[in-house]
Amino acid sequence: MKLQAEKKLIFGYVALCFLMTLGIAFNVLADPVNLNNAPVRSFVQWYSQKSNKAVVVNPDVKGNITVFNADVNQANIDDFFKSVLNANGFVLMAGDPSGVSTPSKLPSQQTDNDDDYEDSADYVPVGDSVPVSAQPQKPLDLTVRNFKLTRVRSSDVLPLAKIFVDSNGGGDVIDYPGNNSLLVSGSAAIMNALADFITSIDVARDQVLIQSLMFETSLVNGVDLSFAAGSASGDKVAGGFNTSALGTALSTAGGSFGIFNGNVLALSIQAVKNDSNSKVISTPRILTQSGQTGYISVGQNVPFVTGKVTGEAANVNNPFQTIERRDVGVSLKVTPVVMGNGQLVLTIDTKADSLTSQMTASDIITNQRHMQTTVQIKDGQTLLLGGLIDSNTTDGNRSVPWFESVPVIGWLFRSHSDSHNERTMFVLLTAHVIKAL
């Protein structure tokens, strides 16, 4: 009996030691998790430390997660980690090391090599990111080719080539302006398609010659240009015009009067020069490519005071003033676009600024006349724009010294005059298409 009691005591002691060892092991392997709106990278770092496994995190993996779990055993830590990632829209991609990414843009090799990745049920679509696969990628059949452009600038073709390459599988396009060419890297299929595309757009553009007459005339008298559209025999025909009637036709600034055929511009220049009530402001000519802006400007670069600091006001020893220079004169900016069937679309921006003789307490005063419009005409036609009225009023006093102050009769030696003059600016513009060789 005594021996049997000793056996029971030994068995109980061994069982107690086993239970204590099991509890210690469970406590060692179990680990509580408490993450409240923590960065997902912190959760990945926790998993890597507990599992002693390396994990690659895609740079696009961002966001926060919340996890409350009483304990996580070492045996099920992988399943727990994967479940938390899937619940928050991420995936664990198998490999050595494994990788955490988003499944929106998985590598194309996934369909052919399903064994290299986790089960497809683990992928939850979310976000816009590029996963980093730990598995070695198959090298692409990349080639580099130089596309020489002969009729257009490479910088103009660069954005079009990039769009074409990106829409056909992707690649790199670099501009080489020194040789007017494009360096492209991509697959052989892209190169063949891009060669045909560049050939179709490497076409010389037409050029447009813009001839213009900017003139001003008296609003009352005007200038007769009716002969400009006359026949070869000198008779006047329909289509001529007289600017004395434009006051009502062009009631708003920048209004369009009409479009004329024939050599209107050359004859109009001579007519304006011969008219005493008219004045030629400028006759600019611009040659530019279709789709490119041509600009010409003639005038003065006038300083304008923009700020002033004096010694008394600012308590400084060196008073100074700031000056900004601005162009004052005549300018013409035209952007022509050659359409089909000899049609032209012109974006016109013209200015005629001038300095006045008046002065204010702060600075000088400038007169500004500005027109901006977009029109469509045919090759060789002449466009008339106008309606910019400049009004000047002049007061004059004249007198004979000493005698003007004589009482009673002093008014006989004094005179006063008022004059009011209104002048209107017109723009005649002719466009000729010069075909590319």
Swiss-Prot record:
Top-level lineage group: Viruses
One Pfam family it belongs to: Secretin
Spans annotated as Disordered: 99-120
Compartmental location: Host membrane
Membrane topology reported for the UniProt record: Single-pass type I membrane protein
Keywords: Host membrane, Membrane, Signal, Transmembrane, Transmembrane helix, Viral extrusion, Viral release from host cell
Keyword Transmembrane helix: yes
One of the protein's GO biological processes: protein secretion
Spans through the membrane: 328-348
GO cellular component, one term: membrane
Signal peptide annotation: 1-30
Bias (Polar residues): 99-111
Family designation: Belongs to the inovirus G4P protein family.
Role this protein plays: Acts in the assembly and extrusion of the bacteriophage by forming a channel across the host outer membrane. This channel is just large enough to allow a newly synthesized phage particle to pass through. Extrusion is a process of concomitant assembly and secretion and takes place at specific assembly sites where host inner and outer membranes are in close contacts.
Quaternary structure and partners: Homomultimer. The channel is composed of 14 G4P subunits that confer a barrel-like structure. Interacts with G1P; this interaction results in a complex that spans the inner an outer host membranes.
Name this polypeptide is given: Virion export protein
Source organism of the structure: Salmonella phage IKe
Gene: IV
